[in-house]
């Protein structure tokens, strides 16, 4: 079974955490790569052909995220990129690229469209896993309720 690692930037890290929280309920093998050097180093050490790295990289692209993506890909991992319409440099080598608009009337980019893409991914994974995923969610929710 694939190991899924997720990583995001200053603001998009929220999206990585949000997707990871849902995926953890649905299946094992989910981790979020922290922004610190140790987290990135151990992510690289753990990466192999069974790894999928989901990178959230939007305008003001993150240099360390690009390096992380290139390094794990060199070890056989698959890279899936969530980015804006201008495309992060990581797009050049990613197996999957999911761009979305980020324009906003404020000085900050909007994550509204990106959140919708994440919600769609959660729905697709839930459907793909079928009853197994639903049973796992029910079990986890039961454990959380009883805690």
Regions picked out by a protein language model, each given a short descriptive name:
Residues 128-147:
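Internal, active-site/partner-interface "lid" segment
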Residues 2-116, 123-127:
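Glycine-rich phosphate-binding loops that contact phosphosugars or nucleotide phosphates
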Residues 1-2, 134:
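Context-gated lysine
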